[in-house]
Amino acid sequence: CAHPENNYLGIDITDKVLILAKRKIEAAYQAAGRPIDNVKIMSTDIERIKGVITPEDEVSRIYINFCNPWSKNDSSHKHRLTYPRQLIAYREFLKDGGEIYFKTDDDDLFRDSVEYFPASGYDIEWITYDLHENEPAWNIRTEHEGMFTEMGIKIKALIARKKPGADSVTWVDPKVLKRMAREAAAAEAAAQEGEGNV
C-alpha cells in the first residue's frame, strides 16, 4: 500500500499461504485508510503462468521469495521457479530490462540458479550470499526469512535483469538434447549401414 502507482499480483499454489497474505493485505490497507485497489492474489501453479499473464500485461518486476528448492533429485529440479524453462516463460511477459528479485535460504537452489539466470537470457546485476550482512533498503523481510535467520541460516539473494532479444537465451532443454543425440546416432547408423551395402 506504500506504492499506489504499482499493481501487484501475488501467486502461490498453497491456499494457506494466500489466506495469510490476504489477511495481511487487508490489515495494511485498512490501517492506511485505503481501499485495496492495486493488489490481487491467486492460487495457481506457476508452471501455468502463461495462461494467466500475457505479453500485453508488461510486468516490470517479479519477486521469487523462498520457493520450494525441489532438491530431492535432479529430475525434480525442473519444477523450480528458477529453472531455465520457467525463467524463459517469464521472459514472455517481463518487459525488456525487467527485473527478477530472488531470495532463498537453500544453498543448492541458489548455486544452480546463479547458472540458470544467464543461460535463460538474464544478467545478474547484484548478488549476495548473506543478505543481512549489508541489508539493502529495498529488502522487506518475510516470515520465512526471519525464521531462517533466527536458525543461523544465511539468506542468499540476487537481482537479475532481462536481456532484450531471444538470442540471449543459450539454454537447451535436456529432452531436446537427448532427442538430437538419438537422431544423430540413428543418422550415423544409417550412414554406416549404407556404406556396408556398397
Feature locations, PLM:
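Short beta-strand element of Class I
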Residues: 6-11
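A short glycine-rich, Lys/Arg-flanked "PGG" loop and its adjoining helix->strand segment in the class I
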Residues: 78-99
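A short SAM/SAH-binding and catalytic strip from SAM-dependent methyltransferases
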Residues: 47, 59-81
